Regions:
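Phosphate/nucleotide-binding beta-alpha loop and adjacent structural elements of enzyme active sites
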Residues: 1-244
Length: 244
């Protein structure tokens, strides 16, 4: 994580701990409706863990057959997840301007760029990045694994539906979820999740193991970091609607 993003994270945590909001507080009913929207659905496809048991691993719907590529913006010190995917013959495209990793795996391709909502300077728009890497190849079964320190909302909201539908599986670490209590930020977060939930089932939610700060208001407790797993709706069926 770059210095700018570390500072931004600390400022956000400080403001929320002091109950300082950039706008009005979000109505509690809106938050409850949001939480109901994103809760996981029991599907006829099991989840398995890919990558490490701690940071670097994800709980993923076990539906890999036919997936050729995974796009993975945000690169950590451990890339066990991507290495495990390559054992399934899935090529992984990684991007992050803040690191200089060395990979000896020919199924891992790295770009020294941040992935953002638009392409400029050291940033590359996700739509543009995917088009560049696929180079005209028609592929409607990709994976997206994203950990970009709070920029995920702008990136998701900038995605066109054509690109979003190409992903069969989406794994995202969502940051700054404590800002659901801030009405302005709630709108941005809610918009991104509604875009995903229109096309995908949520299959799993897991708090990040490194979280040391949790925000609570009106008996609603929200960690700032949650890992979400999604499966495109045409790939799985809800097995018990009473639990969904």
């Amino acid at each position: 994580m770059g210095i700018r993003k570390k500072l931004k994270k600390k400022i956000c945590e400080y403001l929320l701990k002091k109950e300082i909001f950039t706008s009005t507080k979000t109505d509690v009913n809106k938050i409850l409706s949001f939480l109901n929207m994103v809760r996981p659905s029991p599907l006829d496809i099991e989840n398995i863990r890919v990558g490490g048991d701690n940071d670097g691993g994800y709980v993923v719907p076990n539906d890999f057959q036919g997936i050729k590529y995974c796009f993975s913006p945000g690169v950590g010190s451990i890339s066990k997840f991507e290495n495990d995917l390559t054992k399934k013959k899935i090529k992984c495209f990684l991007a992050d301007y803040s690191v200089n990793p060395k990979f000896e795996n020919n199924l891992i391709d790295f770009d020294k760029k941040f992935i953002g909502a638009s392409s400029y300077e050291n940033y590359l728009n996700l739509n543009d990045w995917i088009e560049k890497k696929l180079d005209g190849e028609s592929n409607n079964d990709l994976m997206l694994q994203m950990d970009i320190e709070g920029d995920e909302y702008e990136v998701i909201n900038s995605l066109n539906d054509k690109t979003l539908k190409k992903f069969r599986i989406i794994l995202i670490e969502f940051h700054q979820l404590h800002y659901l209590f801030d009405n302005f930020m709630f709108k941005q977060i809610d918009k991104a999740f509604k875009k995903i939930m229109k096309l995908f089932h949520c299959t799993h939610i897991h708090p990040n193991n490194s979280v040391d700060f949790i925000f609570e208001d009106k008996n609603i407790i929200i960690p700032p970091l949650l890992e979400f797993s999604f499966l495109r709706k045409d790939r799985g069926n809800i097995i018990d609607k009473n639990l969904s």
